[in-house]
Every structure is written in structure tokens, then in C-alpha cells.
A protein has these predicted regions:
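Class II aminoacyl-tRNA synthetase-like tRNA-binding/catalytic domains
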Residues: 1-104, 116, 168, 173-182, ...
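Short secondary-structure junctions
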Residues: 12-19, 81-82, 135-143, 267-278
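Long, charged, glycine-rich C-terminal linkers/tails
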Residues: 18-33, 144-151, 276-280
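Glycine-rich, often proline-containing surface loops adjacent to acidic residues and nearby aromatics
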Residues: 57-58, 105-115, 242-248, 305-309
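Extended C-terminal subregions enriched in glycine
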Residues: 122-158
Length: 325
């Protein structure tokens, strides 16, 4: 994964002839840096505890690597000898309450790349050129698609997808750095401008190596782990059979797929790596079930019955039915 970070940094520095600021901050951050200083509205759904891992009222595990940018920008604003053109490189693990499938994990690796320049303005054409450089560097020969998107900390934003066969796969987002984000850090937006980009490193590495299961990136099996040291195509170790289990559970009305995924991870602890995916097959409100059925499930009147399909598969061995049960 570090090879991707290095390749992207070198490609952009060669193109822009700018200086570099590397950030590798601690994952516990202030809510202000993760949300407020990036212009997230106080009522943003992203702030809800079902999506964010709070440590206390004002502290949290960062939900994106963009949380490193406010402090990076403040440091730039305080530096009397700051360079006129700087690429901020901020990789790291992020922490989310997310659904479980072959492309998602609750602790994804991300990378923020922000170009901050004093003097000449930066426009959407500059942003488009940045996207092209990034995609050509990490996924040579792969076509990308830009879709208008809104992000609190940018203007004129895009979502970045790449074409994989007949489908699109999202790899990141970008935009022009929001003037208020710059101003809040002590950088006068009349004198400074920026290009902001956030990328999913796990997703990029999977696409580069031809990996279809995100758990392989963290596999302990030496046959798998040894292949994560370079960018050559992945050679499958073996194909293990999946085991499916359907669970009928009582939950509060409106419990999201992300909540269910987080509960599965918490319940299984170290065995959570065996879960390939979870999917809600059906939702039935208590009012639609007989009293006998509600009693059997232990379903209260203000709850709903969820039929949850859990697919278990180890990346390096065959699971026994006893283990799965």
C-alpha cells in the first residue's frame, strides 16, 4: 500500500515541481478537526453515532484522513517560510461503522492529497488534470468517470469512479478546497487556493492487484501476506467454500445495515475476519406478526424482525460447521 502512496506522491511532485508535507497523525482526533473545521453542518448525518466512533463528547476516532488536514493547514499558515506550492500527503487507517461485504471494512485505509498554492488560482481544469495523473499512475490503462458531487470541505466537487468491466467502482472524491477551510486555518483564500482529493487505498490496491475480497489485504497466511509486498497481480491461494447462516433477530425499528454490521463485528471479536458479508433478507414489523411468533422471537411491539444472512468464509482454510455454528 505504501508503494501506491509513494508512486502518487512522486507523480504529482514531478508534474507540479512542488514541495511535500507528509502527515501521519494519531487516529484519535478532535471532533472539530474531523467535522467542524471541514465545514460539516452541525446536523450532518455523518456525525451520528451510528456512523462515527466517538471516544468522548469532543474526541473521536477519525472517520476520514481529511481529519488531518486542518492541523496541516494551520501549520502551513503559521510558517513564515512556507513554500508557495505544497502537496500535503496524509495516509492512514480510518474508523467507521460500515456494512460488511467483499469491498467494505470498518477500518479502511485512505489517502488525502491536497495541493495548496499561494498566488495563482487553481481551477476545475487543474483538478481534472490531477485526477488523470492519479488514475494513470495507480491504474494505468483504466478509464475513469467523474460525477458531480457535494462535499462540505470543497467546491465544484466530483466523485471518482473507474470502469471495471460493465460496472463503475468508486475510488475517491475531490474538489477545490473550500475557502472557509483555508480561512479557518489562517490561510487567506484571496492569496491561497487548493485542490483536495481523498482516495480509498484498499480499493485502489484491490483493483491494481486483481483482488476481489478486501480481507485478503489483512490476511495473516504467509502465502497471501507475502503477495502484499509489491504491486504484481494477485495469485489466488485457494478457493474456500462459503457457509451461509440465516438469523432471525429482534432489533429496534430502523436499525441500519451499518449498525448490524458493527454489531456482528463486536459480537464475533477476533472471529469477525471470517465474515465475508451480511445482508438483510427481510424486515417484518412486530405488528405484522402473530402474538405467538412475537413471543418466540422475543419481539417487542416497537421492534422489527430482521432476517439476516451471514456468509462465512476464511481466506486461507475451510471452516467446519461446528465453527460456523
Amino acid at each position: 500500500m505504501q508503494l501506491l502512496v509513494d508512486a502518487l506522491r512522486d507523480a504529482l511532485v514531478d508534474t507540479w515541481q512542488c514541495s511535500v508535507s507528509h502527515r501521519r497523525d494519531a487516529p484519535i482526533v478532535s471532533v472539530a478537526d474531523n467535522y467542524d473545521r471541514l465545514q460539516y453542518p452541525s446536523a450532518s448525518i455523518a456525525r451520528e453515532s451510528r456512523y462515527t466512533r466517538y471516544v468522548s463528547d469532543g474526541v473521536m476516532l477519525r472517520s476520514h484522513t481529511s481529519a488531518m488536514l486542518p492541523s496541516a493547514l494551520r501549520a502551513l499558515g503559521r510558517d513564515p517560510n512556507a513554500e508557495d506550492d505544497v502537496l500535503i500527503v496524509a495516509p492512514g487507517i480510518t474508523y467507521r461503522r460500515d456494512s460488511i461485504d467483499r469491498l467494505h471494512t470498518g477500518e479502511p485505509h485512505q489517502l488525502d492529497l491536497w495541493r495548496i498554492r499561494r498566488g495563482a488560482s487553481l481551477r476545475r481544469d487543474d483538478l481534472r488534470a490531477m485526477v488523470t495523473h492519479v488514475v494513470e499512475t495507480v491504474l494505468p490503462g483504466v478509464e475513469h468517470v467523474l460525477t458531480d458531487a457535494t462535499h462540505p470541505y470543497t467546491l465544484a466537487g466530483w466523485q471518482i469512479d473507474v470502469k471495471l468491466g460493465d460496472r463503475l467502482v468508486e475510488i475517491g472524491e475531490c474538489g477545490l478546497a473550500h475557502p472557509e477551510v483555508l480561512r479557518d486555518a489562517g490561510l487567506d483564500p484571496a492569496r491561497w487556493a487548493g485542490l483536495a482529493m481523498g482516495l480509498g487505498l484498499d480499493r485502489l490496491l484491490m483493483l491494481r492487484k486483481g483482488i476481489d475480497d478486501i480481507r485478503l489485504l489483512r490476511a495473516a497466511d504467509a502465502r497471501v501476506a507475502s503477495q502484499m509486498l509489491d504491486l504484481t497481480p494477485y495469485r489466488p491461494v485457494s478457493t474456500m467454500p462459503p457457509v451461509r447462516r440465516d438469523l432471525s433477530i429482534a432489533v429496534a425499528m430502523g436499525t441500519t445495515d451499518e449498525d448490524l454490521g458493527d454489531r456482528v463485528r463486536s459480537a464475533l471479536r477476533d472471529d469477525a475476519e471470517l465474515v465475508e458479508s451480511i445482508a438483510v433478507v427481510a424486515r417484518t414489523p412486530a405488528s405484522a406478526l402473530s402474538e405467538v411468533a412475537r413471543g418466540r422471537i422475543g419481539l417487542a411491539e416497537d421492534q422489527e424482525n430482521v432476517l439476516l444472512r451471514v456468509v462465512l468464509r476464511a481466506v486461507d482454510r475451510t471452516l467446519t460447521h461446528a465453527e460456523c455454528n
